[in-house]
Amino acid sequence: RQWSRGLGDVYKRQVLPKPSVNRLIQHRLAEKDFVNKLNIRTTRYVSVEKKSDIETLEDFLPGILKTTTMGYDGKGQYPIKKIEDLDSLNIDFSKGYILEKLVKLKKEISVIITRYGNNNFEIYEPIENTHQDQILKHSKIPAEISKKILDQSKNWAQTIAEELKYIGTLCVEFFIDRNENLYAVSYTHLTLPTISC
């Protein structure tokens, strides 16, 4: 993924989405900090630099410890229910990590938004995702969600795209908890292999 780092310098023509945006969305801690500044709810999270940090963070458990960069489809992710779980996990703390507190999850959805031209948008119907062992198993559209969640997820996706000044197609992932609260999880591209016709 680090190919994006030098694109702005290599090409004289403008590269879209901007390489700076790609760098932001490759860093889990940075992307959550960005969304929080927009008053968009995320799950509780905290930066972790060493094992002893987690030993003082019982309030964030049960949670998932994730590398701040790289890792996808369950890679670089460690579910932790209690402090003692750390003893059985082989974690390389020379890397940066983020600890995210688990929510009582009802379902996960994604909103696809395309921003183009003079601040024009196309926002598509939310997609409902099903995971197994932290890996996406299948997706369906439209998602079975309330009108409140439908409107809020589309609004938040548009806000994120606007504030990023994003040009292109963006996928914003959300959690819905059992009390119908919405949480922004991450934002990334949507790849063709996920779509079946």
Question: Which stretches of residues belong to each language-model region?
Answer:
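Single conserved hydrophobic/aromatic residue that forms the stacking wall/gate
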Residues: 1-11, 189-197
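Conserved N-proximal alpha/beta basic substrate-recognition cap immediately N-terminal to
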Residues: 5-59, 70-71
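Structural detector of well-ordered beta-strand residues that form the stable sheet scaffold
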Residues: 15-16, 43, 64, 98-100, ...
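Acidic/polar active-site rim loop that often engages polyanionic ligands
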Residues: 35-40, 66-74, 131-141
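Aromatic/hydrophobic pocket-lining residues that form π-stacking "cages" and hydrophobic walls in ligand
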Residues: 54, 157, 188
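Internal nucleotide-binding/catalytic subdomain
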Residues: 80-177
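A short beta-strand motif that forms the metal-chelation/ATP-contact edge
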Residues: 180-187
